[in-house]
Amino acid sequence: MLDEADRILDMGFSRTLSALLGHLPKSRQTLLFSATQTQSVSDLARLSLQNPVFISTDAAASTVEGSTHLELPANLEQHYALCALESKTNVLWSFIKSHLQNKTLIFLSSAKQVRFVFEAFRRLHPGTPLLHLHGQQKQHTRLDVVTRFGRMQHAVLFATDLAARGLDFPSIDWVVQADAPEDAATYVHRVGRTARYAKGGHALLLLLPSEEQGMLEALKARGIEIPSIKIRASKTLSIGDQLQRLAFQDPELKYLAQRALVSYVRSVYLHHDKSIFKVEGLPVEAFAASLGLAGAPKIRFLSRAQTKDRKNAPRAPTALQSEDEGDVQSSGTEDEVADSDERDSGDEDVDTSQDEPPPVAVEKQGKDAKVSALSFS
């Protein structure tokens, strides 16, 4: 059995895969399963199958080789909602509080975000079991989380895309994508955790306003169209002040918040599709406040990238330059540039040495606010 073979191809290991298949007996039966009919899957079929027969659970599925359309379960109810970056934490908390009797899977873009949201929400006691799953956990921990979540009737699992493929959780009611997927195929794999077999399911995609057009176009190009809903701000619970108190009292949680922020910005920066993921203009300070931080940490890899862009930028006409070199003031960013590489290896990109500004006041909402907040209007 070879799992995630299409991803192996995507990562450039086609020659290695061909060599492995070359050692198999020539007389054999090969079954190729995929949730998505993508070009990589078609390439894999050509590589490993002879005279293949295409079988789909959807009678209307396209049998055209290289079809770009992706199939979704007919019993999946899906929506997207626009959500400012600084509002995501409040929206997630409000959603959980209004769906306590559901089984929910929430996707975030990085392990550090998963860990922070799990630890922060756990301290706030939402009234339903919380679990988290990501690739930085040890194998026995991941297996334990998968087993426990599978057995629970009502629970929330925060996860990276580790949970998007190859896992079959029984009876998930909701899949919430707090961060946009990298592409349409990832979207399909995420929402495919619900509405499995004959059961129904719901999917909600939260998009920044800057992500809306690019993401919807990318999905539409693969045959996926999602209706929009509006989040009622008046019905959304605010937990910013509570997170700020927790971060002040618990240095570990504050540190997790800083790492989560940097990790999110890095994930946006490293995404290839810049029509969707735009690091410029991200409200970093407002996002920091929403995580309970009094100020955003310095993001060193971003400073390095900005410095590199300035160095590579064309020089202004000489007429606009000062004749005296001493009149040109340095921005000082070069002094902040570190020599470490750009890998997401931990904490080298988080600079917490700056003095903390005074606490930021966050408006409190009424206690009986509910997430009909995410009212489907």
Task: Enumerate the predicted regions with their spans.
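A short, hydrophobic/aromatic-rich structural module that often spans a beta strand
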Residues: 28, 314-316
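Acidic, serine/threonine-rich intrinsically disordered low-complexity regions
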Residues: 317-377
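Eukaryote-biased recognition of C-terminal alpha-helical segments
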Residues: 302-311
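Conserved helicase RecA-like core
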Residues: 1-303
